[in-house]
Regions:
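Long amphipathic alpha-helix in the N-terminal Rossmann-like dinucleotide-binding domain
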Residues: 1-5
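General beta-strand structural signal in soluble alpha/beta enzymes
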Residues: 9-13, 31, 61-63, 88-94, ...
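Conserved small-residue-rich beta-alpha loop and adjacent elements
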Residues: 11-79
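Conserved NAD(P)+-binding/catalytic subdomain of aldehyde/semialdehyde dehydrogenases
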Residues: 85-173
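A conserved active-site cap/scaffold subdomain adjacent to cofactor or substrate pockets
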Residues: 138-212, 216
Length: 345
């Protein structure tokens, strides 16, 4: 559906003048799939599918070996690559992999763009590659989620959903934004119960994400909740409010990587199968950026064609601007065409 919207287009904006865009895929891309805290085949396919759909002719994927193993790559990541026809798969650790994609090596071809989430070191490596002409996306830092909930929300499901992004690591951030003290208390109790059932390494990550890195914010009303959420600009945002208020809240939310509506739309489903991008803006970048979709692998080239009548009609405006900015060659190109027209007559 997105590719159907990303097609060449042109219109006659005024008599004799046609403008439009030519949309083409970038020539190559390097995808980074993290493997430091766990293996993420879901990230592999949610990065690779848009690149393949966009028609990028050369897609390379870099993935570190699975943690605690003997240097092997998670077979699930290889299955993703095989199903999508990606043959350039390389086992390289984070920053080294980013550098290899950006500069090229004897075995890894240089690419024009690199995308993918990772550790702070991977993020810094991507920023550094921009200095050498390799395009990257917005910074993809530690994961974060925010839930807007009122007194109608189910604290059991709410606690379960808060723990989804919290278990990623001790640098994650999870926030409950609610108008109800009763819901906050009930959710806190339920969090304790559900945390006890998690493996200790995941429970420790959740406690850090909910405690030092996150928490609960009580607000007077949903309008304040909307304002706070827009200021925070969360990577993942869920709306768990009364049906009568859903549309108003969603309409008011403008800064978020994704907005999941209702308590039957958990973050884990969006992470894996709903079709939402896996790599979303973090650290406030949702104020200005979007998730990685097919558009991230396309470029738009402006097209314009004017006939003689149209360019002569616009000549005086072009000449006036050229004279004001001190560019005589700009103006001369229009004077020449006007003079040629007079001679032809």
């Amino acid at each position: 559906a997105q590719m159907q919207q990303s097609r060449d287009w042109s219109i006659e904006s005024e008599p004799g003048l046609t403008v439009g865009e030519k949309i083409t895929p970038i020539s190559s891309v390097g995808l980074f799939t993290p493997s430091g805290k766990a293996s993420y085949p879901s990230v592999a396919y949610q990065l690779a599918v848009p690149a393949v759909v966009a028609g990028v002719p050369k897609v390379s994927l870099v993935v570190p070996p699975v943690p605690g193993g003997s240097g092997e790559i998670d077979p699930a990541v290889l299955v993703v690559c095989r199903k999508l026809g990606i043959e350039n798969v390389f086992r390289v650790n984070g920053p080294a992999g980013i550098a290899a994609l950006g500069f090229g090596t004897e075995s890894i071809d240089k690419v024009v763009k690199i995308v993918g989430p990772g550790s702070p070191a991977v993020t810094i490596a991507q920023v550094e590659m921009q200095r050498f002409g390799t395009s990257t996306m917005m910074l993809l830092g530690p994961t974060e989620s925010l839930v807007i909930a009122d007194q109608t929300a189910d604290p059991v499901r709410l606690a379960a959903d808060l723990l989804i992004e919290a278990e990623h690591g001790t640098d994650s951030s999870v926030v409950l934004l609610t108008t109800s003290t009763g819901l906050a208390d009930a959710t806190d109790t339920e969090l304790d119960r559900q945390l006890a059932a998690l493996p200790e390494v995941r429970a420790a990550a959740c406690r850090a994400s909910l405690g030092p890195n996150g928490g609960c914010v009580l607000v007077d009303d949903l309008d304040t909740a909307i304002a706070v959420a827009n200021d925070y600009a969360a990577e993942h945002l869920q709306v768990a409010v009364a049906d009568a208020d859903v549309d108003r809240v969603v309409d008011g939310l403008v800064n978020a990587g994704e907005i999941l509506i209702g308590q039957d739309t958990p973050f884990s489903a969006a992470n894996f199968i709903l079709g939402c991008p896996a790599s979303l803006p973090t650290s406030g970048f949702a104020h200005v950026a979007s998730g990685i979709t097919a558009d991230a692998f396309l470029k738009r080239t402006a097209l314009a064609r004017a006939d003689g009548t149209a360019i002569r009609r616009m000549a005086s405006n072009v000449i006036a601007l050229a004279d004001h900015e001190g560019f005589p060659a700009h103006a001369n190109a229009l004077h020449l065409r006007a003079a040629t027209h007079v001679q032809e007559r």
